[in-house]
Curated annotation (Swiss-Prot):
Record EC number: 2.7.11.1
Domain note: The C-terminus (residues 351 to 560) is required for efficient SNF1 pathway signaling.
Record function comment: One of the three SNF1 protein kinases (with SAK1 and ELM1) which are required for growth on nonfermentable carbon sources and nonpreferred sugars and for response to environmental stress. Activates SNF1 by phosphorylation of its activation-loop 'Thr-210'. Required for the regulation by SNF1 of the transcription of a large set of genes, the modification the activity of metabolic enzymes, and the control of various nutrient-responsive cellular developmental processes. Also phosphorylates GAL83, MIG1 and SIP2.
Active-site residues (renumbered): 189 (proton acceptor)
Protein name in the entry: Serine/threonine-protein kinase TOS3
Domain named Protein kinase: residues: 50-344
Source lineage: Eukaryota, Fungi, Dikarya, Ascomycota, Saccharomycotina
Post-translational modifications: Autophosphorylated.
A GO CC annotation given for this chain: peroxisome
Top enzyme category: transferase
Family annotation (PROSITE patterns): PROTEIN_KINASE_ATP, PROTEIN_KINASE_DOM, PROTEIN_KINASE_ST
GO molecular function, one term: ATP binding
Record-listed ATP binding positions: 56-64, 79
Native species: Saccharomyces cerevisiae (strain ATCC 204508 / S288c) (Baker's yeast)
One Pfam family, short name: Pkinase
Amino acid sequence: MVLLKEPVQPLPRSSLLYNNASNSSSRIKETRKVKLLYNPLTKRQILNNFEILATLGNGQYGKVKLARDLGTGALVAIKILNRFEKRSGYSLQLKVENPRVNQEIEVMKRCHHENVVELYEILNDPESTKVYLVLEYCSRGPVKWCPENKMEIKAVGPSILTFQQSRKVVLDVVSGLEYLHSQGITHRDIKPSNLLISSNGTVKISDFGVAMSTATGSTNIQSSHEQLLKSRALGTPAFFAPELCSTEKEYSCSSAIDIWSLGVTIYCLLFGKLPFNANSGLELFDSIINKPLEFPSYEEMLNGATSGITMEEYTDAKDLLKKLLQKDPDKRIKLADIKVHPFMCHYGKSDAASVLTNLETFHELKVSPPSSCKRVELVSLPVNSSFASLDSVYMENFDHNNLRTGADRNSTYSPSIYDANTLSPSAYHNIGSRESSYSSFSSFTSSTAFASQISIQDAPAIGDQQCLIGESGSSLRVNSCEFPQYTTMSPVGEYPFESTEASLSSTLTPVGNVPQRIKAHLVEGKSNSKDDLRIEADASLVFEASDAQRTRRRMSLYKL
């Protein structure tokens, strides 16, 4: 059980609550060079000085990884942001900077408060397509208010939290919001999943991907007008304020937006369901704008985790929510008034001297200690490879036996029962039937890159003239089962492969004298694709056998 902190008291103006942006940003390390390595023994990637341990979450604007600082042993969270936007109709050569990346960085640079997740370091290599934010790690994870087996959008209550547990969460969030608003920052996406709990029970506001700033003095922060034009499409619709849902009148980007989403959050924590819900976006917006606020009855509340609440406490909770979820933003309650509201100050019979959280609700992720394995040579990976990137599905499932040099593979191969004309060494065979990806076309002819990243799987006999066709995003993947061919997909045309045959031969070191013939042709992509066109290559190499079936293996390479 984890002890939640006592209610947060208002801080003096000289405290962290009123730290200015310059003091906060000076604490943050900025690194302009990114190096990505792979440890074949631990099967883990290493980003600069951080060993990647696990995936913490996948958001709309980036994936978050758990990592260990190899210098200090401290655990951190690393958020991975795409430097460039994906836009329909653009080729790989035309890249558009993602404005939200700089926006999030500039906002987080201004923040240093105990109830806001802290930014430690920015890994921003101009040559990388990713930007990495090294953040404070909150081991208890996000605040949960409905059972694990229930989708939040379909939750009907009751909440798995008590009123007192919810009150403790809200006090910390109010403290964090008060700080953000004092810095001219509107979070724009306050919701339970963006409220993280540290190991000591402190609740911290996280995820500033859609945050807005009215602060001056930074040229990287978009103007208020630009932010307003984009804000209606960003965030979580179920937590949108009415002024975000209506297009009939203009609105200003104000702290009232966060007050409303805080009200929706408190409603979820107390009653275990969303205050406004619908089957479609338009219905949801209409409900938020026009539907009156409703509450479960006191009798219903007594059947859930809140069975110990008093009628007075229940009445105070409803009164606070009515003031938070006020349709008119000008009439919404202020943060200072929330802290002194009777519900926040009330202590009923459900309270105790110390409030313990439910381990099922706020469990702490267990992380194994650093490995004490012997020294191993790390494999250097290209930083822009879709295969090697930290948010790649290939790398997350990658088999470390796949990372071997040509010499290693040859030394471990013993012909034994295999025919000399059949490619069957165990080091080659069936590495999860996964494709390998590369950062540039030149890597197809690079012996080191190719030797360390290959995927080989059984293919039908040559007599079977069928084709295997599958989709991969915006590309049409063609793995022909005809005689050996090399297929390339490109928005610009065919590539010459005169030198490829020699490079492949020397790199793969096939068993026996096997003729290898490679040809290339262009395959058209899907015309209605909304994603960027992608270059894809599939090489099928035939290794003839002496048996009647003419057994063969297929090797596939992909640049995604």
